[in-house]
Amino acid sequence: MKSKQNATTTYGKVTTAEDIGQIIRAKRKETGVRQDMAAGMSEVGTKFLSQIENGKETAELGKTLRVLRKLGLNVYIYPRSADPLKG
């Protein structure tokens, strides 16, 4: 994952479900939110949140995006030719 750091969470190019899970877990822990609290505010089950944090490949996209939003994270999609992280 090509990345930028912000405090203790690494953000950047995501290529796998595991990358997304690592970012979600790091952001949740950085903000001091327990897994059950994050699941509740995202309206998903704790088991679901645990699965995406562990990189489950088949996690439902809509729920995953909701978790990201509730944690204050955005998703941007760029064509490879316009990748803002290329350097």
Q: Each predicted region: which residue ranges?
A:
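Short alpha-helical DNA-recognition segment
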Residues: G32-S50
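Basic nucleic-acid-binding interfaces
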Residues: K29
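Residue-level signal for the short linker/turn that defines the boundary of a DNA-recognition helix
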Residues: Q22, G32-V33, A59
